[in-house]
Amino acid sequence: MPAPTLANRRVAIFEDDQRNRERLSGLVKLCGGVGVPVNPPAPSLNRLMAYYTDQRINLVICDHHLSQRGDYAPYFGAQAVAESYRHGIGGILVTAYERDDAELSLRLYRRQIPALIRSPGLDRANLQTALLQAEAEVQKHQLTRERVPHRTIMTVLRVDERNTSKIVKVMMSQWDSEQEVGFPLDLIPAKLRIAAKPGNLLIAQVNIDAARQEDLFFDEFELPNPDALKKAKTILGRP
């Protein structure tokens, strides 16, 4: 059986650097698809679907920082991928700043980003794999093991201030008992945010099979059942 390709797929390319747009378009062509470079200014978020319909777009590639070279777009690439996801268009994010942005501008939208590729390691093979993965997740609801969420309990370590945002630092033994992970306080529903205090336990849907911290997403937060919480604190020796 021949390996799957991007044949007949039209792939929109959001990238504020013209040379990178052309390079990505060339890689898409090598994968069997048709690259559609989005020239500046890029359409606004609420005009994306109109643009996709007009250009017959099937998939999307986005750089994360889209305003480093002028006023290409007033939003992050992560926002564009997430908006596309919500409307049934699969997309991938390409960035060299995945670790710097992981806990804030990436984590806010990570649930709706099927694949994230480091730009220094981008090549035809991993681009094709990521785009086909995005298509399968969005259109067929086929998630890779690393993208399947699981009900996960976590301990709040602290809440850090970062510019105008607050980052909740947690530890999840179901993922890595020695590595702390952060996410924006805004991900937690407003009525539950008061529980984001050091020592408290939270529960969320998390893709704990992800190998990299920047691939983790957090969704559907809840508080532990009071009886279960009391039992857990007794086991852990907490007051």
Regions found by a protein language model. Name each.
Residues 2, 6-19, 24-28, 60:
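Conserved acidic segment of CheY-like receiver
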Residues 16, 38-41, 92-161, 167-176:
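Output/docking surface of receiver
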Residues 45-46, 59-85, 96:
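Conserved phosphotransfer microenvironments
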Residues 86-90:
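A short helix->loop->beta-strand "cap" motif at the edges of active sites that frequently abuts
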Residues 58-59, 114:
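Conserved acidic residues
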Residues 25, 78-82, 105-106:
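Short amphipathic alpha-helical segments and helix-helix/interface helices
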Residues 135-239:
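C-terminal output/effector regions of signal-responsive regulators
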Residues 33-53:
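A short, well-structured beta->alpha microelement
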